Structure formats: C-alpha cells, structure tokens
Amino acid sequence: MKYVVAAASLMLALFVVPISGQSRAGHAESAAASAPQLKFHLDEEFFKLPDNIWPSEAVGVALNSKGHIFLLNRGNHPLLEFAPDGSFIRSIGDGSTIFHAAHSVRFDAEDNMWLVDAGNNVVVKFNSKGRIVQALGRRLEPWVYMTHGIERAIPGPAAFYQPTDTVVGPDGSTYVTDGYGNSRVAKFSREGNLVKYWGDRGSRPGQFNTPHSIVMDRNQNLYVADRQNNRIQVFDTDGKFKQVWDLDGLTWSMCITPGPTQVIFVGSVGKVYKLDLNGKVLGTFGKLGRLPGWFDSIHAIACPDEKTVYIANEFSYRFDKVILDDAERSSR
C-alpha cells in the first residue's frame, strides 16, 4: 500500500500527455576472444534532451510497441520518453522519491511497462494507460537471515532481495531475477501469485552469482545473465536447466531481437557480444572507456532489430544509439 501511494506521482505523470540434461555451448569463452569485430557507429545526436535535464546513472532502456524509447536513470528525472526519431516527449516522475534504486524497465507484449526497483525490493506493472495494476514483492521487506556471520536471503512468498530484471511470457507468467541477495529466479502467475523459484548462490549449473538480466525467446526458453559467473544460463519455463554459455567478461545485460530468426546481444564491461540461440558468438564490438564510441558497464541494452542497439552506460551517465554497419564502413 505504501508503494502504491508513493508511486501516485509517477502513475499520474506516466501517460498524461547436453550432458545428463546439462549442455555447454562449446568453448564460448575462447570463441568470444576470436569472434569477429562487428563494425558500428553511433548516432551521437539521436537523443534530443532539453537543456535542463541531465541523466544520472544510466540503468535501463526499453521500447514499447510504438517504437518509443524509455530511458531509466537514477537522477531527478528518472524516466525519459523519446519518439522513434529521438525527439524528446516527456520526463516522468520528476523529483519523486519513488525509487530507492531504479534498476530495470521492460515492456511486455501487451505494452504493460514493468519497473524494477532493487532498493525497494519490488517489481511494479503499469498498464498502457499508466495505472499501477500489479506490484510484486514487499517494499523494503527483504527476507534475510544470518549464518556464520554472513547475511543471506530467505526466498519467501512475494519477497525479493534486490531484484534486477523481469520478463513476461505469452501466458502472462512473470519471471524475476532476484538478484543481488537471493541469487534465484522467481516465477509468478498472471495474477501475481508466486508459482515457484529456482537457484541459489554458487557456480554450478542452475546456481547463480548475481543473476542480473533475463530474456525469453520465441520458444519460451529463458536466458539468464549470471553476471559474476561470466555466463548465460538457459532454462525452460519450469526452471529446468538446459545450457550454459561461458563468456570472457561479466554478463551485465541482455536483449533479444524480435522476428523468426532471433539473436541475443549481451552487454558486458566495454563490450557487447552478439550470439545466436545456440550460444555461438557471432561477433563483438566496443572497448572500455567513457568517450563517445566507447562503453563502460553496460547496465541495460535494447535491440528492436539486428542492426540497432540502445545502450545504457551506467557510470558515464550516457545512453547510446548504436548502428551496426555493413562491412564497407570502418568501426570506431
């Protein structure tokens, strides 16, 4: 109830104007190192921000069905909406204290917007008219216990411990990576009831060390970015482990392209990987830095098609539109 009251200003602003069942994707780590460098350039003037708005930590980016781009940051203007041509539409939630640690923004197939607040331990669903229609988790109420002097989280019904991301399946089931504390994936019904959860902290298949991002393909396979383990794990919708893809860097963020032939882009530190759905690294681009054309910790990534990638650079407070080029253009 407290969350709904606190979120009122945002609500009003939003829309007013295989081995024994296990499989590893070859030697993805070494394959990533030898993968081709993808050529790209930035559309450096794409996002047309007003002079009085400066984003802070860039943590989320997502597109709705109209092609509008939503940028989530931890500043005084937490949610920024842009038209498909990059023109500024509005700033949402200005000056509010609704977020304790804004972490992710996603849209589902029905154009509902899902906002993940790691600090408040909640995931909130807004319908296409901007009304809060569902809240998962309990605001500021993580499940925690101590063992041998170490703080650990107790996975409990409708309780998160610093959740990180979410994806919604075609049946309305919601999957939440839960996250910094619980190291698990939680599945909820369309109605918001906890169905099951899987995973705990570790490095074995099915375990996680900071599950930080999650996406789903057309066949309802779930891909989880297991950040501190430098890998992607693949599950079915019941949590059955299917594959693990090892990479050579932290797996911060993911997006998956629409259409019949899908690819996954994985954001790391200074680098983006492009993978097919078998875990093959098709190419990489980027290098570490804070200048335009370089990237830092890629906290979020969005890919409306295979040639266009939007990137949230957390620590340089910058959002980029990246265009992947044909072979004749030289990369940055």
What name fits each language-model region?
Residues 18, 22-332:
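Eukaryotic scaffold repeat domains enriched in small/polar residues
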Residues 1-4:
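Positively charged n-region of N-terminal signal peptides that target proteins for export
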Residues 6-18:
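Bacterial N-terminal signal peptides
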